[in-house]
Amino acid sequence: IYDYLYGKNASTADIWKDETHTLRSLLYAMLLPSANEAAYIVADYMSGSSIDNFVAMMNDEAARIGCTGTTFTDPCGLDPGNVTTARDAYLLVRVAMGYDAFAQAAGEESYQMPASTKHDSPYTILTSDKLVSPSSNYYRPYTKGGKTGSLDDWQNFAGWHTQDGETYVSVVLHSPKTDEDPRPALTETAELMDWAFATFTVTAALDTTQPITELPIVYSSQTDTVMIYPADDMQTLLP
């Protein structure tokens, strides 16, 4: 694992060889500082020490949930053979956010990694998703969680946001980094969702208590018309 990651400028949670961690701690390590070694450790554990088997499991699961443009080639995303689309990233987030452990971890600003044989005391890891960090200029209270993905020159972000009881998923891919903004995908996500919440509202298109129309009745001795009501409520997103 460490031989593969060496020299790749991989993000890390400072997890060392021969340390012991729970899967929960490794989940936080993957989601907050994007710890590549944590992803590989989980893959090794879950697959019976076969990274290839785990990658095959990832691709099978992606296909099962409906991804059509995604191919995984490693557990952490460093390999350039990993590809996906905005639609597929949306599907992955929509499924992942349904798991309570994932949703809770993805929305945390920090986490205390436990003491171990390599760390005399617990230590703090911080999230790369600054949209959930109140101390950050990127902070947006409506963002509930998400995952960054970064290489040297660009950044991705997929996350979910809640306002007025409705939840929205956003995906920003291949946003170029600049000297002025090292987290451009977060900037673009914040601008996108600020605009969306200022521009669109969820409105009732159909209401079972409100008639759609009134129709005439030809053969009736008691009434000349009948009111038509929808069978179900329906909401829609309107500007």
Q: Language-model segments: which ranges?
A:
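Active-site-adjacent loops and short helices of periplasmic peptidoglycan-processing enzymes
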Residues: I1-R87, A96-D100
